[in-house]
C-alpha cells in the first residue's frame, strides 16, 4: 500500500467512517469565523452598569462618556448607545456589542421610557428579517439582542412598578437576566431576603426571565453542580470595580472600605464570577433561544401581518423594495454570467485560431 493511500485508510478500526470528527470541523470553522454576541444593559443611573460591563470583559467600553448632572436628568430622554469591541482570547475571537440605555428611569416622568428600547429590539429583528429575505445571505451581521442584564436597585424592598412594566414589555422579545446592583451595600442576610422578594414578585407578575437549561445526564458532576449553583444564584447580586487594591498580600480588583475589602472575583463576597460564568457557558444557548423562540415569534407575527411595511432605523422596508432588491441582484448575476460566457467564447475562438 502506498503512503498516500495509507493516509485515507484506517485498518485499526474496521467499520469506522469518520463522522465522529464532524464536531471538530464545526469547532475549527467557528473559531476561524469568530463569534457575535449582543448584550443589552438596562437600569437606573448610578447602579454601576458601565463599571460591571468593563469588569466582565476587562475592557473600557465608555472612555469618553460624560455623566449628566441632576438638572439634566429631570427631562432626560432614553438614549440607545451601541458599542462594539473585538475581543480575542487564545485564538478565539468575539465580536461583542454592548447596548447601553443611558437615561432610563432618570426623568421625573418615566411613563413609556422603555418604548425606545422596545423599538430598538424590534428594529434589530426587522433588519435581520430583511437581510435574511435577500439573495446574498452569506454575510449577514447578527445584531439581535441575545441577552439583557436588567439592573435592580438594592435600595428598595423589591421591584419597582417601572421594573415590572419593563420586564413584562420585553420578556417575550429578549432573554432577561435580573441583576441586583451594588451588593456591597447589603448585608448577607439582606441580600438573601431581597433575592427571595424579587423572585417572588417576578413569579407573582408572570414575568418570564431567562431559564438556564438543565445539565444533560451525561455531563460530568462538576458541571451539574455548577449549573445548580448558577440557578440558585438568580437574581445575581454583584459588585463591579476596575481598581486593583492589595488584600492579603496580593493584588485584587475590588473596593476598599474602612471595615475591609470587597473583592469583585470572590464568590463569598458577591455573584460576579457566577454571572460571568453563566454568560460565557450559556452564550450559545442564549443565541439559540433568541433565534428559535424570540426571533421566530417576531417572524411569525410579521408573516401573519403580510410584512406590509416596517421601519429599520427610520428606513421604510416594503414588499416592493424587497422585490426590487432581488430583481437587481438577479440582473447583476445575469450580467456576470453573460460576461463569463463572452470571455469563454473569446478564449475558445483564440484556441481554434492557434490550431489552424
Swiss-Prot record:
Principal location class: cytoplasm
Protein name: Septin-2A
GO molecular function annotations of the record: GTP binding; GTPase activity; molecular adaptor activity
GO terms of biological process kind: cilium assembly; cytoskeleton-dependent cytokinesis; protein localization; smoothened signaling pathway
Record-level GO cellular component terms: cell division site; ciliary membrane; cleavage furrow; cytoplasm; microtubule cytoskeleton; midbody; septin complex; septin ring
InterPro entries: G_SEPTIN_dom, P-loop_NTPase, Septin, Septin2
Residue ranges of every copy of the Septin-type G domain listed in the record: 33-305
Function: Filament-forming cytoskeletal GTPase. Required for normal organization of the actin cytoskeleton. Plays a role in the biogenesis of polarized columnar-shaped epithelium. Required for the progression through mitosis through regulation of chromosome congression. During anaphase, may be required for chromosome segregation and spindle elongation. Probably plays a role in ciliogenesis and collective cell movements including convergent extension during gastrulation.
Region (G3 motif): 100-103
Superkingdom classification of source: Eukaryota
Subunit (UniProt): Septins polymerize into heterooligomeric protein complexes that form filaments, and associate with cellular membranes, actin filaments and microtubules. GTPase activity is required for filament formation. Can form heterooligomers with other family members and form filaments. Interacts with wdpcp.
